[in-house]
């Protein structure tokens, strides 16, 4: 319906350009939005306010001319001018229910489009250090990143999911020292325990597996433990592989799969880090000072130059990041989205500066970043900080075990990425209307229950057929439900374009609320079979949209609860 209103306004604008009311050499694009107050109609447009200067007349006078020039259309019941010149459209009841047929015809494809036209997009997310179990912050990144991938795919993009393993650097040495200490029988309470060693129970698990000579497989790589307490390199290799496997198992339990696992260590092994250094030097963007090598990042918007290579010859963490992103570009990804925690904020400018200094024809502002804020977990109103398994933080596995995958994924994606999130375990476990994922799933299950009752009476209802005369639907609640359903395709497009999956959770919560209100107020299993069938058609459309939306969130749509 919004497209219909936009087309009518475009026609009216063209008419006013033809008669000289508006200049013919300018383009005008009406922005049509949903109204918040239904007394103002279903859709509103401010084009008269935007174009009034070009017309040389007050906005309200231009609005009157536009309304007069609108073509006749049976979908529009009436048009009103409000305030200084807003144009409000009231759609006919019959037109509102056309969306029901569309939904039932398109089924799982409803809401999808091909605007991406198959463009390749790489989304990097989670990318945790292989030094321990995934914490709840990684979980938020996984929920947001995977939902964003699903949204992009729903808009016709060819998406590659990538996980970058930081398997080189000081944190890996600390991991090796920690496991080696456990292998030798030490505990964190011993004086000789590594100063920056990891203390969680999972270190004991790694040590025991190493001593037992276990073989672990992490994605496509197999590592067998040597069981030698003195071979720190072997311990390091095994510990990284073991924890990568554990992270993979956590992600599998979370319903997240990756297409590519990229190892930081491979950048060194393949000479890509050194090649990046040489290219930056050749381009004249490096200098030596105080025994270190610096990159002139200030020439690309950074607030100060950054150390690339330290006095001891080791590279700072942002240099392999630059090499890694050059590799992404060379793989042909012109659109790259990095979903990371907000603690990576300082790396954005540095990485982009390094990429510009490479002179590789990479656009300024590439890649895109989606940075999420921290997560606080609470139980009984008190913050939960410690997991026995991890030692110092709450893990993704903890949440899945407590509340299940569906609730964990939904809650972690339910807020703006730039807002801090409080994960209330008690709320996520509750079976009440206050729990949004339960409330939404219950709407789906309720509709399935109605269909089962009809089937028990010998009345079968297909998923992709309109079974009733929709003109019999005359209630305001029915029209509001239809209007809410009609918003879904635009919501999917905007959520992907804006990189904001939380809009989908809010939409589904609102749709479920409208359905429950309607369900409680108006029976569907009634003697008037014609009206019953019309309402069942509306039910089927609601069920389909809820199922489609939950699927994009990676959440199930149960038929029974």
Swiss-Prot record:
Enzyme class: ligase
Gene Ontology cellular component list: cytoplasm
Entry EC number(s): 6.1.1.19
Chief localisation class: cytoplasm
Catalytic activity line of the entry: tRNA(Arg) + L-arginine + ATP = L-arginyl-tRNA(Arg) + AMP + diphosphate
GO molecular function terms attached to this record: arginine-tRNA ligase activity; ATP binding
InterPro entries, sorted: aa-tRNA-synth_I_CS (IPR001412), Arg-tRNA-ligase (IPR001278), Arg-tRNA-synth_N (IPR005148), Arg-tRNA-synth_N_sf (IPR036695), ArgRS_core (IPR035684), DALR_anticod-bd (IPR008909), Rossmann-like_a/b/a_fold (IPR014729), tRNAsynth_Ia_anticodon-bd (IPR009080)
Keywords assigned by UniProt, alphabetized: Aminoacyl-tRNA synthetase, ATP-binding, Cytoplasm, Ligase, Nucleotide-binding, Protein biosynthesis
Motif ('HIGH' region): 128-138
Protein localization: Cytoplasm
GO biological process: arginyl-tRNA aminoacylation
Record CDD domains: Anticodon_Ia_Arg (cd07956), ArgRS_core (cd00671)
Subunit structure comment from the entry: Monomer.
Family: Belongs to the class-I aminoacyl-tRNA synthetase family.
Protein name, per record: Arginine--tRNA ligase
């Amino acid at each position: 319906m919004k497209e219909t209103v936009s087309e009518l306004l475009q026609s009216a604008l063209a008419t006013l350009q033809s008669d000289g009311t508006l200049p013919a050499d300018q383009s005008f694009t009406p922005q049509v939005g949903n109204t918040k107050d239904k007394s103002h109609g279903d859709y509103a447009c401010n084009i008269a306010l935007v174009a009034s200067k070009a017309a040389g007349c007050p906005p309200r006078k231009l609005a009157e001319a536009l309304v007069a020039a609108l073509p006749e259309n049976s979908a529009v019941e009436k048009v009103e001018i409000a305030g200084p010149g807003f144009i409000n459209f009231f759609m006919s009841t019959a037109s509102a229910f056309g969306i029901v047929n569309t939904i039932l015809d398109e089924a799982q494809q409803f809401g999808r489009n091909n605007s991406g036209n198959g463009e390749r997009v790489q989304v990097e997310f989670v990318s945790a250090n292989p030094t321990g179990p995934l914490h709840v912050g990684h979980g938020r990144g996984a929920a947001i990143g995977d939902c964003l991938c699903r949204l992009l795919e729903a808009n016709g993009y060819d998406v590659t999911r990538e996980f970058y393993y930081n398997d080189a650097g000081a944190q890996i040495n600390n991991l090796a020292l920690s496991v080696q200490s456990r292998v030798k029988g030490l505990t964190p309470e011993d004086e000789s325990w590594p100063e920056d060693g990891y203390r969680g129970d999972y270190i004991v698990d790694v040590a025991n597996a190493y001593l037992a000579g276990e073989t672990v497989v992490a994605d496509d790589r197999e590592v067998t433990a040597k069981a030698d307490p003195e071979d720190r390199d072997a311990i390091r290799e095994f510990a990284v592989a073991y924890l990568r496997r554990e992270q993979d198992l956590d992600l599998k339990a979370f319903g997240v799969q990756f297409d590519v696992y990229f190892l930081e260590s491979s950048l060194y092994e393949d000479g890509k880090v050194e090649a990046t250094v040489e290219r930056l030097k050749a381009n004249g963007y490096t200098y030596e000072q105080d025994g270190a090598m610096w990159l002139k990042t200030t020439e690309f918007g950074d607030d100060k130059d950054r150390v690339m290579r330290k006095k001891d010859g080791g590279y700072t963490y942002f240099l392999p990041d630059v090499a890694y992103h050059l590799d992404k570009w060379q793989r042909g990804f012109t659109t790259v989205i990095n979903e990371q925690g907000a603690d990576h904020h300082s790396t954005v400018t540095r990485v982009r500066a390094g990429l510009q200094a490479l002179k590789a024809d990479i656009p300024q502002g590439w890649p895109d970043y989606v940075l999420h804020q921290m997560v606080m977990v609470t139980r009984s109103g008190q913050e939960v900080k410690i997991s026995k398994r991890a030692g110092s933080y709450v893990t993704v596995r903890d949440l899945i075990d407590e509340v299940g995958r569906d609730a964990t994924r939904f809650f972690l994606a339910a807020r703006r990425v730039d807002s801090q999130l409080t994960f209330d375990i008690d709320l996520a476990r509750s079976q009440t209307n206050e729990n949004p994922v339960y409330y939404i799933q219950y709407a789906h299950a309720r509709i399935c229950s109605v269909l089962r009752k009809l089937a028990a009476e010998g009345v079968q209802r297909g998923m992709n057929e309109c079974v009733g005369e929709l003109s019999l639907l005359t209630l305001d609640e029915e029209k509001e439900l239809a209007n809410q359903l009609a918003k879904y395709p635009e919501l999917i497009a905007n959520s992907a374009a804006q990189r904001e999956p939380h809009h989908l959770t809010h939409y589904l919560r609102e749709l479920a609320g409208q359905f429950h209100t309607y369900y409680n107020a108006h029976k569907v299993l009634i003697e008037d079979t014609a009206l019953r069938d019309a309402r069942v058609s509306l039910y089927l459309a609601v069920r389909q949209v809820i199922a489609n939306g939950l699927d994009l969130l990676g959440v199930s749509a149960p038929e029974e609860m």
